[in-house]
Structure formats: C-alpha cells, structure tokens
C-alpha cells in the first residue's frame, strides 16, 4: 500500500483556497486593478433599455467579446442613443460575479468612437433607407399656402420655440400647438417619432385641431447631439406623415436624415416659421395691388368698349341714308310693274282675240254633233251593261243563298227574341220605378208648396192685404188714405178703405 507521500503536492506549502475564497480574491484583484478603464469596441446584442431602465449588451472586436451593462442612472446621462454595430468608447470598471465565474464592464460613460464611426454608421443607414424609397422626391408634399394650425415638435423650453412663435406672430398670427419632446439623448428619437405620429392621428373635428403643417426643430449641436434625429424610427415617421413636415434641425451646415425625409428643410427654426406662413402685410399689399390693377384694367376695358361704340355709331349711316337706295329701287320696281301689267294685258288681249277669231258657228255645231253622237252611243251601251251587271249580281246572290242554312238564322232569331223579351221586361220595370219615383217627388213638392203657401198662413188667423190691382201690400208706406184695399181671410175677402191716424192696439198687451 502506497503512502500519502506518493501523491504530488501532498506536503506542498502552497496555500489552499476554497472556491468562494479564490473567486472573491479574483474579484478584488480585478476591481482593484481595473477600477477605472476605457474600452473601445463595437456594440453587439443591443436591444434597448430593459423595463427596469438598465441596458445589457456586449463590446467586441475581431478577437474578443466583453459583456457590458449600463445602469439606469448612467443611461439617462448619455448624449446619444446606442445602436447595434456602433463603435464606442466606454468608460467604467470591470467586475466579476463569483457565482458564474464571469466578468463584465459596468459602463459609467460612453461616447461614439470618433466622428468617423458615426459618419460611417450614418452613411450605411442613409443608403439603406434611400433604397427603400423613403427619400424619394416624388413623395414630397406641398406646403399649404395659408395654414390654420401649425404643430411644432421641439423642446418646450429654450430659444427655439420662442423664436418660432415670435416669427409666426410677426408674419401672420395663427394657432400653434407644441408637442414637447427631448431633443437630445437616448429618448430623443422615440419621442420625436411619437409626436409626429400623434399629430397625424388627431381627428379633423376633435377638441385639439389637426395641424396643417408640422415643424420639427432643434438648435445647433455636434453630431452626437443631433444623433437622435438620425434615428431610423424618426425617419420612417416623417416619411409616412400625411401632414407636410418642415425639418429645422441644427444650423444650415448641419444635416441629419430627418432633413432628407421631410417635405421641406429649413436652415434654422426661424426659417421654418417663415416657410410655414406668409407675411400678412405682404398679402394685404399684394391684394391691394391686385385690386388696383383689376380696377384699372376694368376701367381701360370699359373705356375701350365705349370708344369703340362711339366710333361705330359715327361710322353707321342714318336711317334715311340706309333707306334711300331701297326706296329708289322700290319706286323703280313699282314703275316697271305698272308698265309690265299694261304690256301683259295687251298681250293677253291679242292672244284672246286670236283664239276668238278661230271660233265659228260651223265649228261649234260640229263639236255639238260629236258630243251628241257620243252620248247616244253611251245610252245604247248602258242597258246591256246594266243587264249584264244585274245577271252577275243575281248569280252571286243565288250562289251565296244556296250556301246559307236556315238553322243559324233560326237560332239567332230565337236568341234575339229571348233578349228582346228580357229587355221588354226590364223596360217595363224601369218605367214603373220611374213613375213611382216621379209620383213620390210630386207629392213631396205638393206638400212643400202647401206648407210655403200664404193660404196655410191664413189658416193660422192671419190675413193678406191686396191693393186695387190685386197685388199684395208689403208695407204701410205704400198705402195712402182713401185707397181701396181688399183683405183676404181664410174664408173670404173683405173690401176696406184706408184711413189716416188709426192706431191698432197690440193684442199681446191685453193678455
């Protein structure tokens, strides 16, 4: 059996560590040695901040890979938005996790690895988005000449928004709606894209009016400061906007991808305000000038028409001048007509005399003899033709009579007789009904006449007064003293003489 001294290192003086001890010692060594380092590398595996606000990714080069983390506090202080593939310089400290034997860098500050790296990334993104057609000039929209509402996407504080509002107020005051965003840092791009999309989703008749034009503005700065406006999400939002967008990011020499996607690029925020609205005073002056030109043109037009009318009136002949030639032609035609009628009458008389001389009693006698002979011949032919016609009609009648059968005639006769009997009965019934109706109507009229007759009034004790001519007396003013009157009662007439001043007592007062 071998002794313990046969195992290598069994009696060595090397210190013995547990796993925890060696891991802790390694952690202290790494953190003490690399407590503050600057690491240059390419961002890999970046997916944006976690829900906690921290960001996890890796820095790599062509031979190694280093895990990295940025805590939420440091993330909010970054002046640019990290992106996949961006080459950066990270400042922080290395640390290890004993539980997994891994190490990483905790980044406190990070910046792009020089303008060259950002420009290379910017050029690659520009080419890719241009290939998708996001910068196509055919997609550009025209700015409205007279907007009602302007939407501004910028920081609510600072000189930019003040310059825009002041410039709009000077040129043509109208409503301005500001959508506040951060114009620098990691959240700049998403906030600007959200603002552009938000303005586009506003309804036309909502409580917040939908702008007619948008201004995305920011002051000047470095490439890193303006990097949020190169964000792909911003470019896509501006390119898809249904509202025309004016880009006013940085100074005139600063170019970002939003400038290529916007419908119009302004060199400064103040220039964007000037593009968005016209100058009210210029519009008023132009309107006044156009109105004056229109009035002058109308005056010249009417003056020219008036002068042309006067010239035409002067050149036009008078009515006597116009009618002189037709009147002379009419007189000449009338004189020619008289002569022509006389000549024509003479010609007709000569022609008639010529025909009259050609006529003679012997010629007339011969013509009469010819006519008598023709009439005699027609008279001789007429009996024979009439006899032939009658024989032909008789033959046709006999032929048709032989074809006729007495049965249809008898049937139709019986049917006609039955119909006549029915008509007779209906006629007698109608006559009786008519006689009864007339008799009832006559009786009703007789009763009505007796009711309306004055004789029925006499039956009730009244009397009718007639004058000497037998006409009824309708009023006392028609009777004079001494007039002979006749009073008719129910049972006869009584003669009376009218007297003056006689008052007849009212029979109703004695009752």
From Swiss-Prot:
Primary localization class, coarse: cytoplasm
Gene Ontology CC annotations of this record: cytoplasm; exodeoxyribonuclease VII complex
Keyword S-adenosyl-L-methionine tagged: no
Keywords recorded for this protein, A-Z: Cytoplasm, Exonuclease, Hydrolase, Nuclease
Location relative to the cell: Cytoplasm
Any Pfam family matching the protein: Exonuc_VII_L
GO biological process: DNA catabolic process
EC number(s) from the headed UniProt entry: 3.1.11.6
Reactions that this protein is recorded to catalyse: Exonucleolytic cleavage in either 5'- to 3'- or 3'- to 5'-direction to yield nucleoside 5'-phosphates
GO molecular function, one term: exodeoxyribonuclease VII activity
EC class (word): hydrolase
Subunit structure, interactors included: Heterooligomer composed of large and small subunits.
PANTHER family referenced in this protein's UniProt entry, alphabetically: EXODEOXYRIBONUCLEASE 7 LARGE SUBUNIT
NCBIfam families linked to this entry: xseA
Family: Belongs to the XseA family.
Protein function: Bidirectionally degrades single-stranded DNA into large acid-insoluble oligonucleotides, which are then degraded further into small acid-soluble oligonucleotides.
Protein name, UniProt field: Exodeoxyribonuclease 7 large subunit
Species in which this protein is naturally found: Brucella canis (strain ATCC 23365 / NCTC 10854 / RM-666)
């Amino acid at each position: 059996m071998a002794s313990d001294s046969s195992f290598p290192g069994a009696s060595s003086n090397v210190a013995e560590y547990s796993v925890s001890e060696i891991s802790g010692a390694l952690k202290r060594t790494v953190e003490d040695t690399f407590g503050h380092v600057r690491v240059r590398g390419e961002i890999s595996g970046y997916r944006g901040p976690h829900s906690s606000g921290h960001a996890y990714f890796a820095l790599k080069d062509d031979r190694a890979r280093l895990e990295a983390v940025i805590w939420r506090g440091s993330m909010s202080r970054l002046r640019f938005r990290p992106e996949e593939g961006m080459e950066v310089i990270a400042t922080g400290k290395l640390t290890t996790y004993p539980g997994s034997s891994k190490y990483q860098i905790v980044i406190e500050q990070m910046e792009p690895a020089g303008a060259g790296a950002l420009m290379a990334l910017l050029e690659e993104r520009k080419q890719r988005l241009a290939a998708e057609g996001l910068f196509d000039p055919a997609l550009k929209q025209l700015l409205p000449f007279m907007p009602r509402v302007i939407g501004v996407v910028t920081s609510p504080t600072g000189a930019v928004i003040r310059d825009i509002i002041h410039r709009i107020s000077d040129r043509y005051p109208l409503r301005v709606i500001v959508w506040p965003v951060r114009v620098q840092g990691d959240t700049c791009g998403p906030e600007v894209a959200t603002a552009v999309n938000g303005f586009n989703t506003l309804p036309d008749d909502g409580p917040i009016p939908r702008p007619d034009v948008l201004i995305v503005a920011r002051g000047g700065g470095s490439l890193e400061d303006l990097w949020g406006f190169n964000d792909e999400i911003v470019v896509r939002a501006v390119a898809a906007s249904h509202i025309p967008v004016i880009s006013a990011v940085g100074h005139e020499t600063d170019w970002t991808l939003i400038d290529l996607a916007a419908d119009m690029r302004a060199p400064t925020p103040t220039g964007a305000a000037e593009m968005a609205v016209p100058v009210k005073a210029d519009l008023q002056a132009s309107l006044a000038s156009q109105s004056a030109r229109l009035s002058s043109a109308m005056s010249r037009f009417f003056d020219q028409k008036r002068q042309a009318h006067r010239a035409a009136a002067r050149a036009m002949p008078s009515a006597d001048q116009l009618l002189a030639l037709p009147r002379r032609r009419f007189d000449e035609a009338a004189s020619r007509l008289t002569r022509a009628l006389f000549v024509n009458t003479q010609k007709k008389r000569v022609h008639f005399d010529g025909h009259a001389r050609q006529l003679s009693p012997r010629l007339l006698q011969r013509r009469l003899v010819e006519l008598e002979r023709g009439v005699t011949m027609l008279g001789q032919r007429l009996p024979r033709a009439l006899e032939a016609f009658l024989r032909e009609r008789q033959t046709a009648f006999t032929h048709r009579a032989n074809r006729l059968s007495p049965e249809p005639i008898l049937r139709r006769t019986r049917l006609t007789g039955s119909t006549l009997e029915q008509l007779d009965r209906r006629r007698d019934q109608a006559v009786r009904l008519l006689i009864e109706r007339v008799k009832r109507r006559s009786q009703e009229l007789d009763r009505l006449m007796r009711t309306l007759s004055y004789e029925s009034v006499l039956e009730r004790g009244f009397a009718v007064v007639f004058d000497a001519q037998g006409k009824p007396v309708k009023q006392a003013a028609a009777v004079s003293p001494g007039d002979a009157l006749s009073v008719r009662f129910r049972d006869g007439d009584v003669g009376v003489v009218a007297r003056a001043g006689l008052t007849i007592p009212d029979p109703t007062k004695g009752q």
